[in-house]
Regions:
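An anionic, turn-rich surface loop/hairpin at beta-sheet edges
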Residues: 124-138
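Conserved active-site loop/cleft motifs that coordinate metal ions or position small ligands
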Residues: 147-153
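Outer-membrane beta-barrel "beta-signal"
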Residues: 25-27, 160-171
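Gram-negative (and chloroplast) outer-membrane scaffold detector with strong preference
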Residues: 34, 46-122, 143, 147, ...
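Residue-level preference for beta-strand/loop junctions
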Residues: 5, 44-46, 87-89, 105, ...
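Cleavable N-terminal export/targeting peptides
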Residues: 1-25
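Solvent-exposed loop/turn segments connecting transmembrane beta-strands
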Residues: 36-44, 129-131, 153-165
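Short N-terminal segments immediately surrounding and downstream of signal-peptide cleavage
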Residues: 21-37
Length: 171
């Protein structure tokens, strides 16, 4: 009985220690664009991302470095609102303010500024690629310290701005 109690106590303490927020974390996940214009969802596809996260100690702030590949619809007005497939590689450092509501749920809001390498129909680095500055306000929630659900609006060159919804796993 003592061994069973000691094992239970050890597992409980170790799970509590593991649940504490780590200083450095890595997140991987998928994104999906939401079109905000007419015909804005015809060429949307699932993308993926990786985040490096640094949680400042004794502070509600965290810093992220995001690398993402997105495939989404570009509606260009000069071509009678015809939808095209846009592809982007985004490098986005950001700062978030975390609102811990409980040990299981934490909301956050933040903003990032970085670079978006954009192209249409041919992949990212083929002929026609363009580099644009990107600013991205973001909202999200971390659930059970490992699941991240987020919304991010990438504000960039007129035809390439987009709303991205994401879900990821924090390691």
């Amino acid at each position: 009985m003592k061994k069973l109690f000691a094992t239970f106590l050890l597992l409980t303490i170790s799970s509590l220690a593991f649940a504490q927020k780590k200083t450095v974390q890595v997140e991987a996940g998928i994104t999906y664009p939401i079109g905000l214009k007419k015909n804005g969802n015809k060429e949307n596809h699932i993308g993926f991302y990786a985040n490096g996260i640094y949680n400042f100690t004794n502070s509600p702030l965290s810093a992220k470095l995001r690398l993402s590949y997105d495939s989404y619809t570009v509606v260009m007005n000069e071509y009678s609102n015809s939808p095209f497939n846009g592809r982007s590689l985004v490098i986005l450092p950001s700062v978030n303010y975390n609102f811990p509501t409980s040990s299981k749920v934490e909301f956050y809001a933040g903003v990032g500024a970085g670079v978006s390498i954009d192209n249409m129909d041919r992949g990212v680095f083929n002929n026609g690629k363009k580099c644009h500055a990107v600013c991205a306000p973001q909202l999200g929630v971390n659930i059970i310290n490992h699941i991240n659900i987020s919304a991010q609006y990438n504000i960039t060159q007129k035809d390439f701005s987009r709303l991205m919804l994401g879900i990821g796993y924090i390691f």
